[in-house]
C-alpha cells in the first residue's frame, strides 16, 4: 500500500510434501510447512511457488519487472528446498518477455489489482485531459495542488517543481510527502488530513479547484466525513492505479489514469508562457497567512509541566541540518513529527504510512542510512515500537552508522 517495490524470497518444504500440491484440504503436510503464497497474495502484486528449476530465470525476471512496473509494490517467490538444491544449465533457462502482456495476464499468480492495472493500460489522452484542467484552472479563483508520495516514486520531483512554479498556486502535501516542499517555500500551504494541520485543511476546504498529483487520497487525507472533502472544489486526480480513481470514498470530477511523470512532462509544455492570474496570487497569500496564523504548536503547550511532544518536535527540527534524514515509528512518533516538523530544504522525512505497523523505526532508519550513503539519520521511536526490533541496535553499532535515536517515553 506504500507503493514500495520489494522482492521477498522464502524457503519452503520440498514439493513432495507441500500441501498445496495436493487436492486435499490439509492444514499442513511437510515439516514446518505453510502455504505462504496464499497468505500473502492479498498484499503482493505477484506471489508464486517456483515449481520448476528451469523457470527460475523467467520467474525472477517477471518478479523484478512487476515490482517496479506501474505502481511499485512487493512480490513474493516461495522456493521449495528441493528446487534450491537443483542443478541448472544457465544457457537453457527460459527468459521473461515483458512485452507479451497476453501471456503475463494468463498468470494466475498475479493479484487482481495487478491484472486490473495491466489490462487498463495508460490510455488516457493526456493532451485533452490537460486542456480540460487548464480550462478549469482559468475559471477558478482559489486553486490548490495536492501533492503525494507518488511524485518521488514516479521520479517526477524535478518536473513537479518546475510545473508548480509555473502555476504559482498553493501546494499542500499528503502524508509521507511533506518533504516535497520545505516550510519556507513560497507556495507552501500546509498539510491537510485528519493528522494534518489547520492551515492545510483550510487551504483545501476553501479551494474551488484541486489538482491531486500522486496521492491516493486515503481516508486519513479525506477524513471519515469524506463527502465533505474539498466540498467546493472541482477535483482532478492523476494516478497510475486505476482502482484508486474509483474508490467509494472519493468523488473525482476528472480522473486521469496516467504515469505522473508523463503527465507532468506534457503539462509543463502546455504551461509555457502561462501568466498567473492576480486572484490566484491573492489566494496564495491567504493560504500563507493561514500557515502563519494557525501554527501546530500553540503557546499554551509550552506551559506543560512534562515535555509536550509537539514542543519537543518543534525544538528538535529547529536544530536539525538541511540534509538530515528523519525516520519515525508510528503513533505519537510520526503524528507529532509530521504535524509539527518545520522541514528545511533538502531534508527527507519517512514513516510507514499504509499499515502503520509498530517496529518500523530502527530498521527504517538503517535502510535510510544505507540508501543515502551514510548520511546522518534521526530516528524517532516510541518506547513500545522500538522494543519490536531492538536487536537492530547491534546492527547500528556493528556498522558504526550515524543514526541518532530519540525515544518517546509515553
Language-model features, listed with the residues they occupy:
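Short coil/turn segments at secondary-structure boundaries
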Residues: 76-78, 148, 280-283, 329-330
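N-terminal alpha/beta PP-like core and its mobile active-site loop of ThDP/TPP-dependent enzymes
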Residues: 1-274, 319-322, 402-405
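Short hydrophobic beta-strand segments
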Residues: 144-148, 325-329, 383
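Internal, active-site/partner-interface "lid" segment
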Residues: 56, 277-292
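Conserved short loop/turn motifs at secondary-structure junctions
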Residues: 148-153, 301, 382-384
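Active-site diphosphate/adenylate-binding microenvironment
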Residues: 288-363, 368-369
